[in-house]
Amino acid sequence: MKYKSIMLLGTASSVGKSTVAAAFCRYFKKKGYRVAPYKALNISLNSFVTKDGDEIGRAQVVQAEACEIDPKEYMNPILMKPSAGFKTQVIVRGKVHCTMDAYKYKELNKYLKEKAKEAYDDISNDYDLIVLEGSGSCAEINLRETDIANMHTAKMADADVILVSDINRGGVFASIVGTIMLLTEEERKRVKGVIINKFRGKREFFEPAMRQIEEIIKIPVLGVMPYFDLDIEEEDSASIKLRKGNGKGIDIAIVRLPHMSNFTDFNSLGRIKDVCIRYAENPKDLENANMIIIPGSKNTIDDLIYLKESGFKEALINESSKGKLIFGICGGYQILGEKIIDSLGVEGDIREEEGLGLLNIVTSFNKEKTTKQVVAFDLEGNEVSGYEIHNGESVPTAKENIWIKEQNGNVLGMKNKEQNVFGTYIHGIFDEGDFGEKLINKLKKELNIEESNDVNYKDYKMSQYDKLCELLEENIDMAYVENLIRY
């Protein structure tokens, strides 16, 4: 049986649309619907590679997990990845389409709308109910002509809209009323309800204000989602939740690169008992860490130069000489090497840059982008898995320091001779299997901290989605929402 799509739009960026959409996905899945997520256009450096080798935004991966289905490219047909110099890499249906100047977006608009519609038709054929998510604010009147992800999608899908607003940042009533007022009459007719998100306090004291806002906008407030402390992946790095330390346990410092991408690579480490993860904003932040991670980067050479100019290079080399564990992922792996060569100008005008010299690899960028899921093995025969997203190839200059290889011999990771510096192209390496837990337990053993045996990360995430669904059912009128999806 087919149902009408339902769309979640926001009064602003970071109001919680992605998380509420994940909650809707989990709710409908548990109710027995064949449900899937869809976001026409996503702007994010935080991406994932599907089983088919297609690249999409992580937000739709989270929502697909909540639906207990495999992520596919048609769930996020357009992904834009900002890079240096006001350039944007445009990924269409999982593959790189072009890299363009940001101001030339309008020239691609018609083509992107066609691709978004094509993907929506495909996903609608495969599933009975689609939970749609918008992007940023749905009332940016200067962007109405080129809109793809918001009311354009609602109209394309003939979907009713639920408006999400964030009370935690203040001004929630003005943002709701202002958003409704800036919509056209046709657009306002689509808005069938409002969800107020991230509420702190007792709801009974808030009820009179909810009734007042309903009188003003003539649209029902479906409920108030409380501010909660669940571990649901966030879409952008500005809102990532890092666990602060208390001076005990394992302290992991993430070097905060200016063009950091795929920050979710280390989320799973933060759930392990007696582990704190934090950003290192300056070189001194590395001194007390037990482990240092250099994450992925959308502009590896620029970030490498930043490490040199900010004093991080000297600090990292110094910490390495003390035997401290240093781990590089993708761009971080390339940075740890001897040299990066960009003869084709893939990232910019700099053709060659000396690396930190902590790993024996030389990286050469090329135009072709590698996107695939991988299963590989370390030196001890332990299976490691995840996905690759990168330009270029890293060639070992000391084969005795190879650490991770695929069965076909392709090298995906290196270590140093002292075995305290490691690097790999594999995103999500800490998420799958027990690799991350083994690594942390090794550190705990060295520091005489009790080892842990934590729950499987996939099971842990499912438990978080279930708790999110419970919050939705307790606080939002989902019977009303279910009536909206019936023809």
Curated annotation (Swiss-Prot):
Protein name in the entry: Cobyric acid synthase
GO molecular function: ABC-type vitamin B12 transporter activity; catalytic activity
Family: Belongs to the CobB/CobQ family. CobQ subfamily.
Active-site residues annotated for this sequence: 330, 427
Keywords: Cobalamin biosynthesis, Glutamine amidotransferase
UniProt cross-references to NCBIfam families, sorted A to Z: cobQ (TIGR00313), PRK00784.1 (NF001989)
UniProt source species: Clostridium perfringens (strain SM101 / Type A)
InterPro entries (alphabetical): Class_I_gatase-like, CobQ/CobB/MinD/ParA_Nub-bd_dom, CobQ_GATase1, CobQ_N, CobQ_synth, GATase_3, P-loop_NTPase
Pathway info: Cofactor biosynthesis; adenosylcobalamin biosynthesis
A GO BP entry: cobalamin biosynthetic process
Purpose: Catalyzes amidations at positions B, D, E, and G on adenosylcobyrinic A,C-diamide. NH(2) groups are provided by glutamine, and one molecule of ATP is hydrogenolyzed for each amidation.
Superkingdom per UniProt: Bacteria
PANTHER family named in the record: COBYRIC ACID SYNTHASE, DETHIOBIOTIN SYNTHETASE
GATase cobBQ-type domain boundaries: 249-435
Pfam families according to UniProt: CbiA, GATase_3
Upper taxonomic lineage: Bacteria, Bacillati, Bacillota, Clostridia, Eubacteriales
